[in-house]
Amino acid sequence: MATVPEPINEVMAYYSDENELLFEADGPKQMKSCTQHLDLGSMGDGNIQLQISHQLYNKSFRQVVSVIVAMEKLRSRAYEHVFRDDDLRSILSFIFEEEPVIFETSSDELLCDAAVQSVKCKLQDREQKSLVLDSPCVLKALHLLSQEMSREVVFCMSFVQGEERDNKIPVALGIRDKNLYLSWVKKGDTPTLQLEEVDPKVYPKRNMEKRFVFYKTEIKNTVEFESVLYPNWYISTSQIEEKPVFLGHFRGGQDITDFRMETLSP
């Protein structure tokens, strides 16, 4: 930042013998008398203001007027000052008081506001059994005739928040035009698959509760759905006709865990 010069030094710098010439013994007396009526108020609107007092000075009149001339030269000098960041910071520090700002955000709220991507699809197990809604909250697997295909359930598969690993994608399976989602409930020590009714104003959402979330894994032309909280527990169908869909603990045996998925156009 620019430093303010000492007034005395600056005055002496502009003091010269030329100022004295006005008051030499052989100088014009008229010039001396004119200085007695000098109007200092007409020197401009600078920051330096002088006032003449009628009291007696210890210094000679010559010295006083020399100081006036030097001060006038000093006033006419242009000082350049570059406005820097530190100057602005100093000004703001007098106006504002710094306080720590704490942001309280909820990841759940942000995730709920995020758009949920979903696809509509139909599922058939490897035995080509279709999934149908047999009663309000029971999902069964059975073979359908061509004229019965309208009974087949259409799923709304939502891609939800969760850790993706080993080609496993977290999804939630809801039934289209129904407020029903596949979830699990624990009965004793065994997780059991169920259709759970939800609030359509809240679901689907990005941050679904874990009971709704399954890992979708693609294996060749089929997909599997594994519980996120219960590894090696899969959405399964029985080889027996018209049995409810359940959560099974075995792969490659009597329980069918692989499905063919048909993606529907939006």
Curated annotation (Swiss-Prot):
The gene is IL1B. IL1B production occurs in 2 steps, each being controlled by different stimuli. First, inflammatory signals, such as LPS, stimulate the synthesis and promote the accumulation of cytosolic stores of pro-IL1B (priming). Then additional signals are required for inflammasome assembly, leading to CASP1 activation, pro-IL1B processing and eventually secretion of the active cytokine. IL1B processing and secretion are temporarily associated. SUPFAM superfamilies: Cytokine (SSF50353). It is found in: Cytoplasm, Cytosol; Secreted; Lysosome; Secreted, Extracellular exosome. Belongs to the IL-1 family. It comes from the Eukaryota. GO terms for molecular function: cytokine activity; integrin binding; interleukin-1 receptor binding. The keyword Secreted applies. The record marks K168, K178, K187, K201 as: Important for interaction with integrin. Potent pro-inflammatory cytokine. Initially discovered as the major endogenous pyrogen, induces prostaglandin synthesis, neutrophil influx and activation, T-cell activation and cytokine production, B-cell activation and antibody production, and fibroblast proliferation and collagen production. Promotes Th17 differentiation of T-cells. Synergizes with IL12/interleukin-12 to induce IFNG synthesis from T-helper 1 (Th1) cells. Plays a role in angiogenesis by inducing VEGF production synergistically with TNF and IL6. This is Interleukin-1 beta. InterPro entries: IL-1_CS, IL-1_fam, IL-1_propep, IL1/FGF. Residues 1-113 form a propeptide. One of its GO terms (cellular component) is extracellular space. Signal peptide: none annotated. PROSITE patterns: INTERLEUKIN_1 (PS00253). Monomer. In its precursor form, weakly interacts with full-length MEFV; the mature cytokine does not interact at all. Interacts with integrins ITGAV:ITGBV and ITGA5:ITGB1; integrin-binding is required for IL1B signaling. Interacts with cargo receptor TMED10; the interaction is direct and is required for the secretion of IL1B mature form. Interacts with HSP90AB1; the interaction facilitates cargo translocation into the ERGIC. Interacts with HSP90B1; the interaction facilitates cargo translocation into the ERGIC. GO terms for biological process: cellular response to lipopolysaccharide; cytokine-mediated signaling pathway; fever generation; immune response; positive regulation of cell division; positive regulation of immature T cell proliferation in thymus; positive regulation of T-helper 1 cell cytokine production; positive regulation of type II interferon production. Keywords: Cytokine, Cytoplasm, Inflammatory response, Lysosome, Mitogen, Pyrogen, Secreted.
